[in-house]
């Protein structure tokens, strides 16, 4: 998940705007800013409505802010619209708070969850520790099954710290393996490679099954986890501003961009795919590149797809480095 919540609140909440500013979570992915404004205008006069989008890819991050002219309208909007079902989403409406150090860096990364746990199950498990701003369970879009990874953003860092202290290494109901609960990595920090190394060698990765696209003609089969160990030694050649570039090697001659979209799309937002082709034959030369906007999602894609078989080829997937093909 993005740090858009804190970034946006830094911009819009420098002044005390009282009890008129609302944060709206779990919006449908295709909902527009105009539709957001229209929905909340049915309650009262809206001063501003802002749908938060990814700064690189431009897609909705699933939440936004609505500021009313009248505090009573804001309170009525919470009472009326909180819990409203929109498409497949149940939106959450609550007061937004001005940015402060107490709410910075309160985003948690959870891995090793039972695949049967839903987003509501995860929220219910962490709710005793404080107010949850938003949450997300990573799901394979082809099968609809959980990948056992989630992100939860608390209202305060202290609440997130308490959740880590209580649940990191804990075995939730229905799991024979302990889960990992830690602060989500900031792509600008040097810790990002440590996170990737942990993902690649975690118990959840060893015991988790492969990603299967049953309805498609491509099927992935896992190799030994040791085959992925080389990922942790590379230097990431990317940045949060340009996205995270992933290098895919050993593609078949018939591979095309559609295959890469199918492979990496279930893991998160993909902004660009490119298959490198022979100039004369227009056949794939055996490698390609995928750019993803979110570091954690890119790392999970690498950990899941490196060493998998596509047709008769075993793929090598890693962050692009200066030594990768150009």
Curated annotation (Swiss-Prot):
- Classify the main location: cytoplasm
Q: Which UniProt keywords apply?
A: Cytoplasm, Developmental protein, Gastrulation, Repeat, RNA-binding
Q: Where is the RRM domain?
A: 20-98, 106-186, 244-322
An annotated Gene Ontology molecular function: poly(U) RNA binding
Q: Which domain of life is it from?
A: Eukaryota
Say if the entry is tagged with keyword Cytoplasm: yes
**Disulfide connectivity?**
none
Localization per Swiss-Prot or TrEMBL: Cytoplasm; Cytoplasm, Cell cortex
What Gene Ontology terms for biological process does this UniProt record contain?
3'-UTR-mediated mRNA stabilization; gastrulation; intracellular mRNA localization; mRNA stabilization; regulation of stem cell population maintenance
A single Gene Ontology CC term: nucleus
Q: Which Gene3D superfamilies match?
A: 3.30.70.330
> What Pfam families is this protein classified in?
RRM_1
Q: What does this protein do?
A: RNA-binding protein that binds to the 3'-UTR region of mRNAs and increases their stability. Involved in embryonic stem cells (ESCs) differentiation: preferentially binds mRNAs that are not methylated by N6-methyladenosine (m6A), stabilizing them, promoting ESCs differentiation. Binds to poly-U elements and AU-rich elements (AREs) in the 3'-UTR of target mRNAs. Acts cooperatively with cribp to stabilize AU-rich sequence (ARE)-containing mRNAs. May play a role during gastrulation. Required for the vegetal localization of vg1 mRNA.
Q: How does it assemble?
A: Interacts (via RRM3) with cirbp. Unable to form oligomers. Part of a ribonucleoprotein (RNP) complex, at least composed of elavl1/elrA and/or elavl2/elrB, igf2bp3/vg1RBP, ddx6/Xp54, ybx2/frgy2, lsm14b/rap55b and, in a subset of RNP complexes, stau1/staufen.
- Entry's family note: Belongs to the RRM elav family.
Tell me which PANTHER family the record gives: EUKARYOTIC TRANSLATION INITIATION FACTOR 3 SUBUNIT G
Spell out the protein name for this chain: ELAV-like protein 1-B
